[in-house]
């Protein structure tokens, strides 16, 4: 799923959630990153780029220690990687979700937003990933969330 080499050890997610295939849904693999401190732009971009283009992940969720940190990471992705990615060009707005829930004020999965800063429901997002094959996923299909 991750397709990372040994030298990419520091680029592995904090944990990986796999929702098994059922009769009505596909297997869904979502990586989670928990960020408590600011990393360099170069390191963040390298990590996000590898998740986007070198893995078979269905999605990635960044849970950050503050709203400022999650916004910084979101803008790095939106401005630097999203416009260039061939693999993510149709679903890129919703491949990464971001949260500042470590900052307090709600459940971790109640405060998720996509690369454009729009609220996204974790349950609906996972449901969409499970019910829609990769080549058919489109960000515009998620506007009802």
Predicted regions and their residues:
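Non-catalytic C-terminal interaction segments of nucleic acid-processing enzymes
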Residues: 42-46, 56-59, 63-145
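A generic secondary-structure signal
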Residues: 18-21, 50, 79
């Amino acid at each position: 799923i991750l397709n990372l080499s040994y030298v990419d050890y520091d680029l592995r997610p904090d944990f990986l959630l796999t929702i098994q295939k059922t009769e009505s849904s596909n297997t869904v693999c979502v990586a989670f990153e928990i960020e408590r401190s600011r990393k360099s732009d170069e390191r963040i971009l390298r990590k996000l780029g590898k998740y986007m283009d070198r893995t078979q992940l269905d999605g990635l969720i960044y849970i950050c220690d503050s709203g400022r940190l999650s916004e910084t990471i979101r803008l790095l992705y939106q401005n630097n990687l999203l416009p260039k990615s061939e693999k993510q060009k149709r679903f890129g707005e919703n491949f990464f979700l971001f949260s500042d829930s470590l900052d307090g004020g709600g459940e971790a999965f109640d405060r998720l937003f996509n690369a454009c800063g729009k609220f996204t429901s974790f349950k609906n997002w996972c449901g969409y990933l499970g019910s829609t094959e990769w080549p058919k996923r489109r960000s515009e299909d998620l506007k009802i969330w």
